[in-house]
Amino acid sequence: MDVLHAHDLYDEQLIDRVGDAVNEDAGDDLDTLVDGQQQQQRVGFNRQMDILLDAPQEPPLGVFPAQGGPNGPPRLRKKRSFYTMTKPTPPCQSQEPEMCLLMASVTRAMRHVREDQRGEYFANYLVENMTSQNYPNGVGLPQHWGQL
């Protein structure tokens, strides 16, 4: 086997020398060296193309930055939940809550009182003003719990 291999190597050298003689070359293999340098330069210029041609048939990662690439590892998309999605509120919910006339007048009057006296003022105002004289037949008083 070794003899056969050595014989093939000798034949290749002989063919190279014959090629030099045919081309009227000096036999210094300068043309082979130049061809090798040109081949190396071609490989350097087309390295990216060679990588792409040798790659499996998949798109490069740079095309889809979400899959990874220069910005870092891929990010998982947040899965939306029906309960956490914000929805536009109807205009009736964005307004102030329903309030009876008595409560509206109490809050208006309490704006002029200091904060430490507001609780006492609130109770006194209701006792003084929640009378049948001010609200005949209960008109303007709270009709159900939570309205006051």
Curated annotation (Swiss-Prot):
Q: Please name the InterPro entries in this protein's record.
A: Soti
Biological processes per GO annotation? sperm individualization
Residues with attached carbohydrate: 129
Alphabetically list the UniProt keywords.
Developmental protein, Differentiation, Glycoprotein, Spermatogenesis
> Which superkingdom heads the taxonomic lineage of this protein's source?
Eukaryota
Disordered, as annotated region: 56-78
Keyword Glycoprotein appears in the UniProt entry: yes
Q: Name one Pfam family in it.
A: SOTI
Function summary: Post-meiotically transcribed gene that has a role in late spermiogenesis; required for actin cone progression during spermatid individualization.
What protein family does this chain belong to? Belongs to the male-specific scotti family.
According to UniProt, the name of this protein is: Male-specific protein scotti
Traced from the root, the source organism's taxonomic lineage reads: Eukaryota, Metazoa, Ecdysozoa, Arthropoda, Hexapoda
Q: Which gene encodes it?
A: soti
